[in-house]
Amino acid sequence: MRNKIIILATAVVALVTFTASKQKSVKIFLAGDSTMADKEEIAYPETGWGQTLPSYFNDNVIIENHARNGRSTRTFISEGRWDFLISRVSKGDFVVIQFGHNDQSKKKADRYTTPEQYKANLEKMVSDVRAKGATPILCTPIERRKFDKNDNFVDQHGNYPNLVRAVAKEKNVILIDMQHSSMDFLIAAGTEGSIKYFLHVKPGECKKHPDGKEDNTHLRPEGALAIGNLFIEELKEVSKQHKELKPLVKNLNNGEIKLTYTIKIKEIETLKSNTNNNLDEGEKQAK
């Protein structure tokens, strides 16, 4: 009897191990701007919130961060970055899309996108992802840090976040409302308490900004971790209404959350430059 129990237990363990090894990996692609993008070491402590995401998932989840500094939906598409991303997407994958900071920058004509074109670009992205049998996830842009003299929070995105919400509603797309969650987070932190989350660096602290900088758009590691956590918490909440998110939620882990690089920037840029010569020129203009 004892031998039979041992044999049965061994068989169960073997079956579980075999099943786990056969489990299909889940891929997440990130498309966005500098607030999401991976950063090279020279830019430290500037950090994109996309850098935190791999730590939230187990090894069954593979993340490719295609977000790049200075990109709007228009330039991300025109430089061939979107086509390159889509060429790597397969059925069952997920594509997280967060743009808006550069689209609404009227003072920067090289990246500005009209509201009408912004909405059309998001619709194109959603359509392209679905055509590959993958799941699009739209994110409203995270908030910049701005408070008035009375310590009231000031939104700077205008109607662009509402256009993301409109596309999500009209096309029945999963929406992660990063604007609302990040706004609530910054208001709770307050005028002074929120400084530590953004790229306020002293002279000599950052190689990229040797004279120092007060930047209320880009994140420090503390800010990236906070925004990454907001994304994951909302993802878990939204998954209650969207069962297609089950592969992501079931692969979340409870380990220590830390910063990481999903795919080295130079490696992914090399891959992309082999498919589109416009990428290098676009990279120079965005620096």
Give a label for each model feature.
Residues 80-225, 229-249, 260-268, 279-286:
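Alpha-helical cap/lid subdomain in secreted, periplasmic
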Residues 37-45, 67-76, 105-113:
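Acidic/histidine-rich helix-loop elements
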Residues 22-68, 83-91, 287:
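Serine-esterase "nucleophile elbow" of acetyl-processing enzymes
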Residues 63-65, 246-253:
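Short, conserved aromatic-histidine micro-motifs
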